[in-house]
């Protein structure tokens, strides 16, 4: 995790700058905070997804339930190794999860709900 040197200016900004919070369509579940009642209402992650896209699916179900998702400007450090870009097996799992997501009723309904961004694509 990268950290700035503790200069007077860096410390001033650290304690006085407001953290930006923005509304988004989905968040990565590597660091997710969700109200328990929402988790239970939506029955958590769809276990049909293996390793990939379960966070997108859950986020879209949150949105379809009429709730909002916010992303705070914070940093989380993960020191684990990720080899999925080098592994054909992980690539296949990723593609299978994407195909499952893109063909799901949740994705179809969410695409109709979410507003397109200016270039015509959806913000998914």
Task: List where the protein language model places each region.
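Generic hydrophobic-segment detector
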Residues: 19-20, 49, 87-88
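Catalytic donor-sugar/metal-binding loop of nucleotide-sugar-dependent glycosyltransferases
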Residues: 22-23, 30-32, 36-50, 56-77
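Sequence-level detector for tyrosine residue identity
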Residues: 15, 49-52, 108, 122
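Acidic/His-rich active-site region of diverse nucleotide-sugar glycosyltransferases
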Residues: 1-42, 91-94
């Amino acid at each position: 995790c990268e950290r700035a040197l503790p200069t007077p200016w860096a410390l001033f900004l650290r304690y006085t700058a407001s953290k930006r919070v923005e509304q988004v369509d989905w968040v990565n579940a590597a660091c997710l905070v969700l109200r328990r009642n929402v988790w239970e209402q939506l029955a958590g992650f769809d276990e049909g997804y293996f390793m990939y896209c379960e966070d997108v699916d859950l986020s879209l179900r949150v949105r379809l339930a009429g709730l909002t998702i916010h992303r705070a400007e914070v940093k989380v450090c993960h020191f684990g190794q990720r080899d999925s870009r080098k592994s054909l097996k992980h690539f296949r799992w990723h593609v299978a999860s994407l195909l499952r997501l893109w063909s799901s009723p949740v994705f179809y309904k969410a695409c109709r709900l979410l507003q397109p961004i200016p270039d015509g694509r959806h913000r998914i």
